[in-house]
Amino acid sequence: MGRLFAQAGGSGLVHPGYGPLAPVRDLATGLPLLQLPEGFSYTSFGWAREPLDRDVPTPGAHDGMGVVAVEGDVVTLVRNHEVVAGWGSFAPAAASYDPRCGGGTATLRFDTRAGRFLGGHASLGGTVQNCAGGVTPWGTWLSCEEFVSAAGPVTLSNADHVLARDHGFVFEVPADGVSRAEPLLAMGQFKHEAVSVDPATGIFYLTEDTDPEAGFYRMIPKVPGQPVRGGRLQMLRAVGAPDLRSGRRVGERLRVQWVDIPDPLAGADAFGEGLGVLRQGLAAGGSRFTRLEGVIVGDGRVYFTATNGGDAACGQVWAYHPGAEVLELAYESPDPLELDYPDNVVLSPRGGLVICEDSDQPVQRLYGLTRGGGLFEFCRNHVQLEGQMGFAGDFREEEWAGACFS
């Protein structure tokens, strides 16, 4: 896929991609779960309720995921579970931040040559709404909470609970073993979506999934590669452009500055909205985005998506050039039929982006975006079950998430 991304141009859905899509049967279950171009195959694994180590059932609400280690043909992945519930942690006590909470991560091992799932274990628990995150250059996973609250009474999934600890943080998960379940406080307390690290500088870039206003952040660590040691949190300011939610032009380039966040831990505001960090950044002159989701560093750029940004409110893809301190609008969807609500995003090793869709459309799609701005549909969710794998229903409207390369 990467070679096509790197070589092709054009714009919109005029790009042919790999050709028409048709149902393809899963190599593991024999079910036609996806629609793909001719010649592509896939294997499903890690279904909800399937046992992990210690016979722990795999939680539902699969979300962000990344490859944290490769040993020969075996890849190790860490996957988020965006659970918003107070039924308790599924991870061991030592890896549980708040024992009342049901979100967290699972670490998985897969043999790519044999096409076989080797097993997995709970590696972080006691968190809430672990949405996306990101892989670090040193081989760990950063898991982001998209939920902000002070300790105390709270409603989770329409049920009343009492949180033992504050929430709205990023946690680090190793490739082997389990997380220390220690929040990385320098990354702030806000509705985190994703994070990506620039290997050249060690700077962390973070997105915030709030509507109608959101910020794009960076954290400059005191010690590169050791975010637990602290750092400086800042929000992006596009000079002369305080509002980037709409009214922008594809290819437009804006000069970037950064404003400091005085108190990164003041996210749980008095209004109960979890917008304390955002308000600090905007008051200091930071620029407004809306519903920032995926972020990935590569090719000397930092790409990130605004799910409902743009004049049609169908989504934007932004590219920040840290070397030049320039922000560029790389793509904007003009219509929900073209692309609706881009979410998780990953850079192909050969260039170009893979974009996960999370919209109100009846079928969710996986897209490729070439360096030249050409967009094409690569895959469709085709999951319809009648009791197979323990599930029944039409799941074609469920979001894509966790796209990654090994």
Q: What residues fall within each predicted segment?
A:
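Sequence/structural signature of beta-propeller domains
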Residues: 1-406
